[in-house]
Amino acid sequence: MTIFDNYEVWFVIGSQHLYGAETLRQVTQHAEHVVNALNTEAKLPCKLVLKPLGTSPDEITAICRNANYDDRCAGLVVWLHTFSPAKMWINGLSILNKPLLQFHTQFNAALPWDSIDMDFMNLNQTAHGGREFGFIGARMRQQHSVVTGHWQDKEAHTRIGAWMRQAVSKQDTRQLKVCRFGDNMREVAVTDGDKVAAQIKFGFSVNTWAVGDLVQVVNAISDGDINALIDEYESSYTLTPATRIHGDKRQNVREAARIELGMKRFLEQGGFHAFTTTFEDLHGLKQLPGLAVQRLMQQGYGFAGEGDWKTAALLRIMKVMSTGLQGGTSFMEDYTYHFEKGNDLVLGSHMLEVCPSIAVEEKPILDVQHLGIGGKEDPARLIFNTQTGPAIVASLIDLGDRYRLLVNCIDTVKTPHSLPKLPVANALWRAQPDLPTASEAWILAGGAHHTVFSHALDLNDMRQFAEIHDIEIAVIDNDTRLPAFKDALRWNEVYYGFKR
């Protein structure tokens, strides 16, 4: 069972009584056939639920009102099978607070050249019915997505499925609670921000709990629970000699297990699905949570270090969006560069906390080594390299008057040499279009040093995320040129200034 099983998407057909009962009967019949086929053949993450025809303002308003009140409804897919005068939709759309997708399709794929008549034309009017619906959306400044294609087309299926992921993610975000264990890393700017504005814009709440509250739960974990989790470690990872039974770091592994169990219990009891820690606020914990954080991220929790609640929330959001897709999603940081003409590379990592969902190894190494900051005992961590191939890194920043999402498309590559003295998980990539352009654009746009790294999601997913939340997006990819990028930032400043 996944998070998508908790939601459904309503399929709404727009028409009108002008065409008579027989036409509406055929419209309903077609809709039932299309919904059944999409549910069985399209591999959609959510179930489509067909709703009664929307043929009058009252019917349409009732559908939209019911969608708002139904917690299982993640959004609406609307198909204008016939012409549906858009003034009928104004009241409904004005109150709708769920994501909206217009599926611009028709029942038949090919025209029946020899038999087409006006009855056929009146029944199959998506071509201009969809334009009428599009006008009222534009007139009302209604955020909605559009997918064009025949309902049997696999590309249309993929695009509808991607939109469903966004719709479910938006509903989950409205309920998301972010727990900060301690505050931000002192004097750091980009990890701070306006939590009230974030809750108004996205819906997630951010609050702080003293590390001592967590420590109480950690200290209450039983030895039996620790032993059971250690057994799981033994079967899931390759333990170094120091971390095995009788190894000189075995107790550190046990303490890491205690912290993991305590953190998970605390998060579950509080209904949290994202959290932060900071190495400057560990009072009462024996080590910086490393292994615990890595494993919790793999279970779907959002996380970021140094109190970075925006990145923690973004990671949770992207984890939900990518549920069931191939490839992983992780907290990440641009750590250091490899400058070589024609082969500039970025080595991404963090002190400890990289999610094993992006690991290339089936069984990562579990090790305990010294950590030079934090002033605590040596922490346990998983060490691995990252899968290769196309990926993205994304950052959500607070500009005071708005949020900006930055996305850099990257190509993850195999590490050309072993890293015998680097005791942390890492990812190596080429930034698009090249490192100088990508880094300069990122810096000019104010991108954070913390990011969410994903093999599972792509630029289209993040564009749709920005659209569905009505936030600015700045894209850095192979098409990026710095003069045009700077111009886009200036234009955005004016555009969003007028939107205030």
UniProtKB/Swiss-Prot annotation:
Question: CDD domains of this UniProt entry?
Answer: L-arabinose_isomerase
Pathway named in the protein's UniProt entry = Carbohydrate degradation; L-arabinose degradation via L-ribulose; D-xylulose 5-phosphate from L-arabinose (bacterial route): step 1/3
Q: Name one GO biological process term.
A: L-arabinose catabolic process to xylulose 5-phosphate
Q: What class of enzyme is it?
A: isomerase
Give the similarity note.
Belongs to the arabinose isomerase family.
Report the protein's function.
Catalyzes the conversion of L-arabinose to L-ribulose.
Name of the protein this chain belongs to: L-arabinose isomerase
